[in-house]
């Protein structure tokens, strides 16, 4: 019952061993399984998150430029945080092109002078507590800076959710900004759409088609079943 040798390990040694076993699951099968499942889950969320982000970015890039700033009679300006509103813009631009008209889709932050423009269609969502989306946060200042040389007929559509108290608040801001401008003529009153409702969007199309200020008449968007 004699002790022939004795070694004392510092606290850092035990800490290192504890973290090593915790991260590797050494000596504990259940812990190893939990760590494996956790690692796979983290990898899954990283990959899917990257794919969603990339898809949203490419969606914005692919449909942004259809014609040039200098020759487009129709300008579709979009405010969107996640890119969903661009789908409605793309739907309208395709039909405008089918009539042989030149059209361009741009984010609201790219607002500038459009020498040939006659019609603006503005589609914008609202971010947070009534704030503009990230691609529209400079629109108000740019609108005040650039004066269009022609008379512009315009229509504004706001996208939002009635579950938020400030439903389509930024679209209201844009409407209040543009309406008093002398050379801008409102085609339709501000349209507010809840949760990207295609039914409500088609209601706007019906009103657009009935207006005497519109030359192009749109087909309704199909509801996917």
Label every model-predicted segment.
Residues 55-125, 130-137, 141-145:
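N-terminal beta1-alpha1-beta2 submodule of the flavodoxin-like/Rossmannoid cofactor-binding fold
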Residues 25-28, 49, 79, 83, ...:
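Glycine-centered flexibility sites
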Residues 1-74, 147:
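Conserved histidines in hydrophobic membrane contexts and catalytic metal-binding motifs
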Residues 3-6, 96, 190:
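Short hydrophobic alpha-helix segments
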């Amino acid at each position: 019952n004699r002790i022939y040798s004795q070694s004392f390990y510092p606290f850092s040694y035990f800490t290192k061993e504890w973290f090593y076993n915790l991260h590797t699951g050494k000596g504990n099968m259940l812990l190893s399984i939990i760590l494996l499942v956790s690692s796979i889950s983290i990898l899954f969320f990283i990959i899917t998150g990257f794919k969603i982000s990339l898809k949203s970015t490419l969606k914005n890039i692919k449909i942004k430029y259809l014609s040039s700033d200098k020759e487009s009679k129709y300008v579709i300006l979009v405010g969107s945080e996640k890119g969903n509103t661009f789908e409605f813009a793309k739907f309208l631009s395709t039909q405008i092109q089918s009539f042989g008209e030149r059209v361009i889709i741009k984010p609201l932050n790219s607002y500038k002078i459009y020498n040939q423009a006659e019609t603006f269609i503005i589609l914008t969502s609202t971010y947070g507590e009534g704030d503009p989306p990230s691609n529209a946060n400079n629109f108000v200042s740019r609108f005040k800076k650039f004066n269009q040389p022609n008379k512009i007929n315009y229509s504004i559509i706001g996208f939002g959710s009635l579950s938020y108290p400030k439903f389509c608040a930024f679209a209201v801001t844009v409407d209040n900004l543009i309406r008093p401008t002398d050379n801008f003529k409102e085609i339709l009153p501000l349209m507010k759409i809840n949760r990207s409702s295609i039914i409500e969007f088609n209601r706007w199309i019906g009103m657009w088609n009935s207006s005497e200020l519109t030359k192009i008449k749109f087909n309704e968007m199909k509801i996917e079943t």
